[in-house]
Swiss-Prot record:
Stated name of the protein: Probable translation initiation factor IF-2
PANTHER family per record: EUKARYOTIC TRANSLATION INITIATION FACTOR 5B, TRANSLATION INITIATION FACTOR IF-2-RELATED
UniProt xrefs under Pfam families: GTP_EFTU (PF00009), GTP_EFTU_D4 (PF14578), IF-2 (PF11987)
Family recorded in the similarity comment: Belongs to the TRAFAC class translation factor GTPase superfamily. Classic translation factor GTPase family. IF-2 subfamily.
Region (G4): 134-137
Keyword set includes GTP-binding: yes
One GO MF term attached to the UniProt entry: GTPase activity
Ranges of residues in domain tr-type G: 5-226
Length: 592
């Protein structure tokens, strides 16, 4: 028996206001306008665009590109919610449930912050993608015709409109090249395994949408192994996209099934903050087809079973506390239940990190985004001490305080798309813990980098203020003003920085403490290499006995401080200070 092939899952991503939702609406419209009678194109949380509908919509372009009869995928399943969170939640062990991504970019302004973030997330999950250079209708002088393929449209434009388009695409190609991505307009790409295709589109007029769907089909067949799209006739596997309370139904979960079959009465295993849990399916809800949807208020129907690939609303006892991004497994044989609970528990444990190692604390709204953030932070060299889903807690503040003791730059909680309880905010402020929150990962990270740099600088300054700086001086012949109690002599600073309060050493042995430094009869805070100054030395020292005119003296530096200078803070010493320190340590060795 031939195994069923499912449609690839497609996620639309990009910066705010680039036209993601409008483009999705335009794509979904093709499935409505060119659907087969009775076909359910709308699922819970996603929309099916069948390949026959694409062929009807893009007929002339299909023929021009010689694709008729060559596409084996049944269609596309577009995730209805565009953006970062939806993509992050489409997670599974070893990769992503998403098979393809469309990165939507405003052709008039190029790649922006969230676009870059989306791009890095797509790459981190290894998902093939296509770039939709949207807002083609905004190109100066462009003449639009509704739903016209881009390849036909570009041939019918004035030269100046084409020139403007080429200029904007060129800028986008350069931006992508700076991120290490080789891209070009799709009709110029010769090797799709080496170059990312850019498809100019207009979500307003529909121009280029046919091209986008055909390029997606080509990319899917080029990069998605057929086995990945094969669906087993066994217990369902899926991912929770959203959990909410529905009047009359209680807590429900909107689930995307990517394999197997889910039936009414099935035991399912999923996860909450406290680990894996089981529930029993009471009802499965799907949208009605357009023909059945006679009453606008009556859009849904209960079904007995659902086969992958599908988006379905699951009503079950025990869904309270289940978190978006959690895996979902159906269990048909009770003997398989312990293994399913263990498997889901282990998968969640891989994301929820808690260890004694140094690092920041991370909080996110879903398991999917949490996993993405941890992956991103590690790539940026920021360790994570603890990560979890939901608002920050008292325990997080305690953990951050412990982290700060080891490294002040790790005394922070990064809160992605979650509210911070007022009492936790107050406790963090009084404990010196920084809470950085936001909805854009790059901005949270940039703010953390700025803050941690300030903390590191302040910490280093505090440490350096406690360390004795190296210096090398010579007693000037003929400039002994007082021989003892205290000795007052003229000296030249040969290297380093001399400050009051330091102890001087000769041949590695302490000889006295510098009480004051004067230049031309006035006290000064320090003297540097090349300065000639008078200093007073207190201690059991007599000029002519312990020290003599012409002697070279060094600032005495305790062994622990010398080690810190050499192995941790050497970059904060001037070259002459390093030389003074190294010479001083040699005199210590000789006297030892």
């Amino acid at each position: 028996m031939q195994q069923k092939i499912r449609s690839p899952f497609v996620v639309v991503m990009g910066h705010v206001d680039v036209g993601k939702t409008l483009l999705l609406d335009k794509i979904r419209g093709t499935s409505v306008a060119y659907r087969e009678p009775g076909m359910i194109t709308q699922h819970i949380g996603m929309s099916l665009v069948p390949w026959p509908a694409v062929e009807k919509f893009a007929g002339p372009l299909v023929d021009r590109l010689k694709l008729r009869g060559r596409i084996w995928i049944p269609g596309f399943l577009f995730i209805d919610t565009p953006g970062h969170a939806a993509f992050s939640n489409l997670r599974k062990r070893g990769g992503s449930v998403a098979d393809l991504a469309i990165l939507v970019v405003d052709i008039t302004s190029g790649l922006e912050d969230q676009g870059v973030e989306s791009l890095k997330l797509i790459q981190s999950r290894g998902v093939p993608f296509v770039i939709a250079a949207n807002k083609l209708d905004r190109i100066y002088g462009w003449k639009s015709v509704e739903n016209r393929p881009f390849l036909f449209a570009v041939e019918e434009q004035e030269w100046h409109a084409v020139a403007t388009l080429e200029e904007q695409i060129g800028k986008l190609i350069t931006q992508l090249a700076n991120l290490g991505i080789d891209a070009d307009r799709y009709d110029r790409v010769r090797d799709f395994s080496k170059q990312v295709p850019i498809v100019p589109t207009s979500a307003v007029t529909g121009e280029g949408v046919a091209d986008l769907l055909l390029v997606l089909a080509g990319v899917s067949q080029r990069f998605i192994p057929r086995e990945k799209l094969q669906v087993r006739d066994g217990p369902a596997r899926g991912v929770v996209m959203e959990v909410k309370e529905e009047r009359g139904l209680g807590v429900v979960a909107d689930v995307i099934l990517y394999d197997g079959k889910l039936r009414k009465g099935d035991v399912i295993v999923t996860a909450g903050l406290d680990g894996s849990r089981q529930a029993k399916v009471r009802m499965l809800i799907m949208p009605k087809s357009l023909e059945e949807m006679r009453d606008p208020e009556d859009k849904f129907m209960a079904v007995q079973e659902v086969e992958a690939a599908a988006g379905v609303r699951v009503v079950a006892e025990g869904l309270e506390g289940v978190v978006a991004g959690a895996p979902l497994l159906a269990v048909w044989d009770p003997k398989d239940l312990p293994e399913a609970l263990k498997s889901v528990g282990e998968e969640i444990a891989e994301i929820k990190i808690e260890s004694d190692k140094e690092g920041v604390i991370v909080r996110a709204d879903t398991f999917g985004t949490l996993e993405s953030i941890i992956l991103f932070l590690r790539q940026q060299g920021v360790p994570v001490r603890k990560a979890d889903v939901g608002p920050p807690t008292h325990k997080d503040v305690v953990e951050a305080v412990l982290s700060r003791r080891k490294n002040p730059a790790y005394g922070a909680i990064l809160a992605f798309n979650v509210k911070v309880p007022p009492e936790v905010e107050t406790e963090a402020q009084s404990s010196g813990v920084k809470i950085i929150r936001g909805e854009i990962l790059y901005r949270i990270f940039d703010e953390y980098v700025k803050w941690s740099t300030e903390v590191k600088t302040k910490t280093v300054e505090q440490v350096l203020s406690q360390l004795t700086r190296p210096a090398k001086i010579q007693i000037l012949p003929g400039y002994v003003f007082r021989r003892s109690d205290p000795a007052i002599v003229g000296v030249k600073v040969l290297a380093g920085t001399l400050k009051p309060g330091v102890t001087l050493a000769k041949d590695g042995r302490e000889v006295g403490k510098v009480m004051q430094i004067q230049r031309q009869g006035k006290p000064v805070a320090e003297a540097v290499a090349g300065d000639e100054v008078a200093i007073s030395i207190q201690g059991d020292v007599i000029v002519g006995r312990q020290i003599k005119e012409g002697d070279v003296l060094y600032v005495y530096i305790p062994d622990e401080q010398a080690r810190q200078w050499l192995f941790r803070y050497k970059q904060y010493l001037r070259k002459d200070e390093v030389e003074a320190l190294e010479e001083y340590l040699k005199t210590r060795k000789k006297s030892a």
